[in-house]
Swiss-Prot record:
This is Mediator of RNA polymerase II transcription subunit 4. Transmembrane segments: none annotated. Residues 71-124 form a coiled coil. GO terms for cellular component: core mediator complex; mediator complex. GO terms for biological process: regulation of transcription by RNA polymerase II. Component of the Mediator complex. InterPro entries: Mediator_Med4. The keyword Nucleus applies. Keywords: Activator, Coiled coil, Nucleus, Transcription, Transcription regulation. Residues 189-217 have a biased composition (Basic and acidic residues). It holds the Pfam family Med4. It comes from Cryptococcus neoformans var. neoformans serotype D (strain JEC21 / ATCC MYA-565) (Filobasidiella neoformans). Residues 188-234 are annotated as: Disordered.
Amino acid sequence: MAHTTPRSHPPPHSLLQNLTTQSLLLSHLFTLIASPPNPNTSTQTQLNQVYSALQLSTLDLSGLVKEVGHHQEAYRRLVEKKNEVAGLEMRVRGLVKRLEEGRKELEGMIDQGERSLEDIEKSEREPVPAKTLMAHAQSLSKHSSAPVSSLLAPVDKAQYAPWPTEMSMRMGLLFQLEGSMSGMGERGVVGEEQKAPQKVEERREHVEHEESDRRYDPNAVFQLDLNSDESDED
């Protein structure tokens, strides 16, 4: 089992370097095979050296492939963890948002409870008599509850109704002041009639400017009468 040592270069750089080395060794190998045998040099020795170098490069490439596989697997796990962390972050953000909404709602409930507690303590310090409450409730019931049917109980005609009746209107202030309750009343201006102030128009006389150094020229006078009799006779 080959033991892979940690490399100083990243996997892509190591792979490119290994493939370049193998390409050079293969080119050298093909050159040796294609060249004619030289009696001065040992071709077999050179072939053995190139073969050994190719074998070492192949083993190194195998280790690089395994290392790249481990690297890709680790990167895949890293991406999964990253997505998992992103999902957890979204959940945490949602929980924090709901906690903030709950905190605001709880603060509102606490404030409302404090106000209710103050009202309760105030009512305990200053209690309202029962007679006052009953009188207030009875006065409100006339306007908030429906009238009792005559089939269930006799109707008290002297009971105050929440709406004005015809008799109460006839006994009101308008009837006492002898106001007319039928037909159209007198029409006119309410209150004393006030005359509108007259606007006085100030007329300014036209000021004629005379020039003393200007001479009178009779030929410079134009006839401005457009409807003269002379034009009709022509």
